[in-house]
Every structure is written in C-alpha cells, then in structure tokens.
Amino acid sequence: MLGKNVEDFTVQDKERIGVVLADSGFSGYLRVKDILPMLESMYHKFQKEDFLEMCKKYQLPLDKKIKEFSMGMKRKLQIAAAVSHGADVLFMDESTAGLDVMARDEMLDILREYMETPGRSILISSHISTDLERICDDIYMIDEGKILLHEETDKLLDQYGLLKVKADQYEALDKAYILAHKKEEYGYSCLTNERQYYQENYPDITIEKGKIDDVIIMMKRGQQE
C-alpha cells in the first residue's frame, strides 16, 4: 500500500490513510468544535480550514452535539475528519448502511468529489451492491478470507450474464464460458462472463444482464465449473 510494505509504515505514512466506519467514531456528547483540538493533536498535517469548509458545505453545525446528528450527518462528519489530514487512501466499512436513499446519494457524490484528485484511492467494504456499481472501478468478492472473484465493475456489468436454461438445454450448452451453475425448478441458472457469446450462439435461451447480486449468489451458492 502506498508503494511499500505496511510493516514498514512510518507515522507519516499512516496519516495518509483515512478510515470511515459504520459507527460515527466520536462520542455523541461532543460537538464538532470539541473534536477540532483532538484532530489537530492527532495529525501533523490536519488542515483545519479545509475541515471547517467541509463542515459548512455539508451543513454540519459546530455547536450541536453529535448525538443529535442524523445518520447521514454523522457519516459526513467522519468523511470530513478522514480526509482533512491529507489522506490518499480512504477505507470505508459499511459506511452507507442504514442511510436513506437521499443520504446515500449525497455520500456517493462526496466520494466522487474526493476521487477527482489524482493519486487517491477508496477501498469500500459494503453489502449494498448498487453503491458498488455506481462508484467502484473494481469489485472483489471475498468469502472466509478467500477471493472468489475479482473483476472490473464495467466488465462485470457489460459482459457478465445469467442464463436460464432447461435441463436438456444445459446438457447441450457449451460451458467454456460458464463460471458457475445452480439447479433450479425449471432446470439450471448459469453465470457467464461472456454474455454476448451465448446471445449470438443460443438465441432460444433466456439470458439476463449480470448484476453484482446475481454474481455473489452464483459464486457463493452455485457449483463452480
């Protein structure tokens, strides 16, 4: 990470990393202005003016106790704190969980703005697949510490597909591009990373466009080829 082994990280290297967790991370009895001296003492490169500007932009009152903030406001505060010390890498763990549709959309806009600066990266752990589809360049599916799938998001959405076939169709199917299959009442569902190949060569079978949720279910519950 950041071009070096994490075991060799210096304090300065660690300050280039920001973290946003599902919890606010701050005591609810504190106000935003109360955490300013904390951030200043924790980070050598804390940019107070930038932090205050973000609080103003995100409409975070400085004199209000954090416990009175909405869930969306708490997430915005976390992001403001996480990026206000020159962070080049942002770790986010289920940070949009529990937010309503509007709050999640605002969060994604904030992250897109953060990524406009060259050299920055975001690592997002989330079970909300629509968020991943909208903002991530790459998708990793991890189960029990094992990477089951790594794919570019655009490729996953454009080239992956779900085939719905009867038993006899499945037997006659060229399985060269089938990643996994699952027994269904009607026959089989099959995950492919070459949807166009099957559309061109098997016009009689039902083929749906791939979605992250479909891929997750098939890679987890289906039988891999």
Residue spans for each PLM region:
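Conserved ABC transporter NBD signature motif
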Residues: 1-8, 12-13
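ABC-family P-loop ATPase nucleotide-binding domains
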Residues: 15, 19-78
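Conserved catalytic motifs of ABC-family nucleotide-binding domains
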Residues: 86
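Catalytic Walker B motif of ABC-type/P-loop ATPase nucleotide-binding domains
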Residues: 90-94, 99
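Helix N-cap at the start of a conserved alpha-helix in ABC-type nucleotide-binding domains
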Residues: 101-103
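ABC transporter nucleotide-binding domain
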Residues: 108-192
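C-terminal coupling/interaction segments
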Residues: 180-225
